[in-house]
Amino acid sequence: MCGSTALADKLHVQDKSVSQEAFTIQQCQACGFQFTNPRPDAASIGKYYESDAYVSHNSGAQGLINQTYKVARYFTVRRKVALITKLNGGQPGHLLDYGCGTGHFLAGAKKAGWQVTGLEPSARARQDAARRVGQAIQQPEVLATLPAGSFDVVTLWHVLEHVHTLNETLDQLIRALRPGGKLLIAVPNVTSFDAQHYHLDWAAYDVPRHLYHFSPATMRELLARHGLIISQKLPMPLDAYYVSMLSERHRPAERQSGMVGVLQAGYQSNRYAAQHDGQYSSVLYVAERAA
């Protein structure tokens, strides 16, 4: 992120969702930024998403964890739509959802009166989203062709950590924002309690799909380098329980503690965050151009 070449291996983490391969997470010794390195390039990473359990690309995914995700999504979509409407002065406007998945948030926003645009790399998810939203969903490459200043709000819900062209994409997203518009970025927090508690089994490392592993400090630095300030840092408390549920499944059988362990870890993570400057399992950053 900062351009330093002083890098050190931080962790060696296994992809327990798809390939079972091991990947290295490195940390910059200058700015503290953590990232998966080496990682598959954009042309070859698609195979690491080829799982019916990857719920953000597959509305038909089954099982307890995926059903829990869908129940939580029903409630969080409402909260997300209410939030963007509040940030836009209480009125619907023009929304760009970058990495819109199967389109549930877009559909909720459209129902609330927003003019919506969705971009999504997965062909399967695009088709699902198009049916759900009732309009075409484009590939991410379209971002560079969108008119400058055409959106009141741009959202990335657990997407930025997947983007190969990090700086270029951020610049294009900022360009698409109108003056005074808001950029919302939700990402896992590598300095959360549950990240430390589950360590190598922490599901939100999600290598190699997650290329970057942000903390509030490194997110602040990244956005500042693009001329943005963080106006709000909002908790995503349900993520602590969902990530803990996935992480318990990643543990060896003899170390799993079932739903009791999930509830304890989720509660402890949120309690820790409330006492330590909002270090939640996932954080939603509301950013805008610096004055």
What feature does the model see in each segment?
Residues 1-149, 153-157, 166-172, 235-238, ...:
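Conserved N-terminal segment of class I S-adenosyl-L-methionine
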